[in-house]
Design a protein with these regions (language model features):
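Short, charged/polar micro-motifs that form catalytic or ligand-binding hotspots
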Residues: 50-54, 69, 140-143, 215-220
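Short, conserved catalytic/metal-binding motifs centered on acidic residues
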Residues: 64, 109-122, 153, 213-222, ...
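Conserved aromatic-histidine-acidic binding/catalytic patches
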Residues: 49-56, 141, 180, 184-187
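Gly/serine-rich nucleotide phosphate-binding loop at the start of the catalytic core
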Residues: 2-84
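An internal, acidic/charged active-site-proximal segment
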Residues: 178-262
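Active-site-proximal, Lys/Arg-enriched surface segment
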Residues: 51, 82-167, 171-173
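Short glycine/proline-enriched coil/turn segments at helix->beta-strand junctions
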Residues: 70, 107, 231-234
Length: 262
């Protein structure tokens, strides 16, 4: 009964601007048709969608489930079963990508940001989890934590105040990670390249083969593997040094101090 009260939609009072957004989001979630024969999967989908939109800094299913009232001490298995057989992440990302095309004219570049991220894990048998430096520790007391590593590709809108919309999420598990699928073991740069290839293929499939794809990344992309990537109508911009590894140094160039700039 308390969960039903949380999702109850009412007309906004007109005094607070945030109530209009919450009302429309709740109305959209409650009226979205799903091909389910039982009410439990439909309510589970509503709970997760509401938590994903309303709460911030929630990345895992367990974190989303804990936002529901009453707060469960043990996460029910229905939240995990909801994605085991019926959820295709690639199809979901491509569906979200198609919805961003209406905001990008064909004569403008489709801009994405590529960056690596880690998701903290505490389980002992989670595939791909490995020990990484813990950024929450103090500088004078460095420690480790278990986490999964991913590469996120986010679409950037022309509005300077807009946040990026994640349109692709690719695992980049360490080669030494236990219980991981061999196809998920890759470096971060390999994840960047695979993400660019997927998004370029989506643009081509949408009839936008001539549209330019602009990729923006940080200094981790300063590698020859990304600098020599040949994709049609694709441009990559990353932060580089004066002696960037994107460039092939001339043969016979003296090394050490006093080396000529290239």
């Amino acid at each position: 009964m308390k969960n039903n009260k949380l999702h109850r939609t009412g007309q906004p009072d007109g005094q607070h601007h945030n109530t209009h957004l919450v009302y429309h989001l709740q109305h959209l979630i409650s009226t979205t048709p799903l091909n389910t024969t039982r009410p439990e999967p439909y309510r589970t989908h509503q709970h997760l969608a509401h938590a994903e939109l309303i709460t911030t800094a929630r990345k895992t299913i367990a974190q989303l489930a804990r936002t529901q009232h009453p707060y469960p001490n043990h996460i029910p298995n229905r939240y995990y079963r909801h994605f085991q057989r019926y959820f295709d992440p690639d199809a979901a990302f491509q569906h979200l990508f198609r919805h961003t095309l209406h905001a990008v004219p064909t004569d403008h570049p489709y801009t994405i940001a590529l960056d690596g991220t880690t998701v903290p894990r505490t389980g002992a048998y989670i595939p791909g989890a490995h020990w990484t430096p813990n950024p929450t520790n103090a500088p004078f007391a460095r420690g480790l934590r278990k986490a999964q590593r991913f590469v996120m590709a986010g679409w950037l809108d022309d509005d300077p105040n807009a946040r990026c919309v994640p349109i692709y999420w690719l695992p980049t598990f360490s080669p030494k990670a236990r219980y991981a699928n061999p196809t998920s073991r890759r470096s971060e740069i390999q994840g960047w390249i695979a993400s660019l290839q997927h998004i370029r293929a989506w643009l081509d499939a949408a009839g936008r083969a001539e549209q330019r794809l602009l990729c923006v990344g940080d200094g981790r992309g300063d590698t020859q593997a990304l600098g020599k990537l040949e994709l049609p109508n694709t441009v990559c911009c990353v932060r580089t040094r004066k002696d960037s590894r994107w460039c092939d140094l001339p043969q016979g160039t003296p090394s050490g101090r006093g080396r000529r700039r290239v």
